[in-house]
A protein has these predicted regions:
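Acidic, divalent-metal-coordinating active-site segment for phosphoryl/phosphodiester hydrolysis
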Residues: 11-14
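Helical "lid/coupling" subdomains associated with nucleotide-phosphate turnover
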Residues: 1-3, 17-20, 24-199
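Conserved catalytic-loop position in the HRD/HxD motif
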Residues: 7
Length: 199
């Protein structure tokens, strides 16, 4: 089994490509890219809320992810099966909150949840379609985080476009805070706790 771990931060996005054969995790590749929700929000501030601006962000991020894909051929491994996608960041926890239909963020419900790729993509589209005012009002976002949600969603969309794993494991903690242990314990996907929110 293999796992692609990603952490979308404020100023960077970290990727770790890990082999889990035999229960002992082996790091096969690691990359820290100088792009995060804050830096992307600054670069695309005037266009991030438009469809054109969002797709421009995604295209820009995909170009930066491609060297990692060319080296490790992760998409090929995903097609063969046995690859887990595990993410941590305000972006993926927000997507999980949307899928669960939470009226406020609750870490115990979000941490460790396994989302189907379809649910995660649908939650992303919902957030993208809300617009600035809708993101300000959404209980899982709020005014303090609204400007950073779509840049984070753009990173997630770029990751999903290159590496469309069947499920996404969500962790409310960093790459260095036990994610490998969580990944090793995730032997098979469990259904997400709840359906898509239609708020």
């Amino acid at each position: 089994q293999r796992a692609l771990l990603f952490d979308i931060g404020g100023g960077s996005t970290e990727l770790a490509w890990v082999r889990l054969d035999g229960g002992v995790p082996t790091l096969m590749g690691f990359e820290s890219l100088p792009m995060g929700v804050v830096t992307l929000a600054e670069r695309f501030a005037h266009v991030a809320y438009s469809p054109f601006g969002f797709h421009a962000m995604v295209d820009d991020i995909v170009e930066k992810l491609l060297p990692f894909e060319r080296i490790h051929r992760i998409a090929h491994e995903i097609r063969r099966g046995g690859v887990h996608l595990l993410g941590t960041s305000g972006t993926v926890t927000t997507l999980a909150g949307v899928v669960l239909g939470l009226s406020r963020y609750r870490r115990p419900l979000v941490d460790g949840i396994v989302l189907s790729g379809e649910d995660a993509d649908q939650a992303l589209r919902l957030l993208r379609d809300l617009g600035k005012d809708g993101l300000h009002r959404h209980p899982c976002v709020g005014p303090e985080r609204a400007d950073f949600v779509l840049p984070g969603c753009a990173v997630f969309a770029a990751i999903r476009s290159l590496w469309p794993a069947e499920h996404v494991v969500v962790a409310d903690r960093g790459l260095r805070e036990g994610m490998l242990l969580r990944m090793m314990r995730t032997t098979s996907p469990k259904p997400s706790r709840g359906g898509m929110s239609r708020e």
